[in-house]
Amino acid sequence: AQCHEEYYFQKGTNYLAFPMDEGNTVEDIERYYDKIKFTDYTHALSRAPMLKAQHPGYTLFMHGTHGMRGLSCADCHMPYKAEGGVKFSDHQITSPLAHIERTCQVCHRESADKLRGYVYERQRKVNEIRTRVEAELAKAHIEAKFAWDKGATDNEMKETLQDLRSGQWRWDYAVASHGASFHATDEVMRILAS
């Protein structure tokens, strides 16, 4: 998966580290970060110690229908083509929807329009939930700032800040992969709902 994977830079080094010691679900990775007390930044309003998801596309893909069935990225994003009697993988990496006859329809027998509609409907459902979560997170950060401004103590805010960290992390993890609304629709909706 190379760069389509969740990673972070260890503080004080230029080396990538992969937070999968606890497993490869969003909860496992969060637990890893919490265990090592890792923080990417402190939120300006809420003061929550935040995590920033990088590119968890492959990690999420592995929890989706195609990943669990052993497909690779190249199966859909670099479909086979033939030129001059030679069959090879197309290195013009693109959306599988651009060449449905060489991607989706290799396995699925539905029409191109039906398959395209299926993808767009999955994306629509995830985006609907994502939009609601974004609004709630924004309100929560503003409410935390209000509490700080009214004199809340670190001890009083501890649980709230952890909830903000967790909620923002899960939202970010779900949306930072870009293609997860199709690659792992059910997993992304589960993450956004948690």
Mark where each language-model region is.
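Primarily the internal scaffold of c-type cytochrome electron-transfer domains
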Residues: 1-75, 79-193
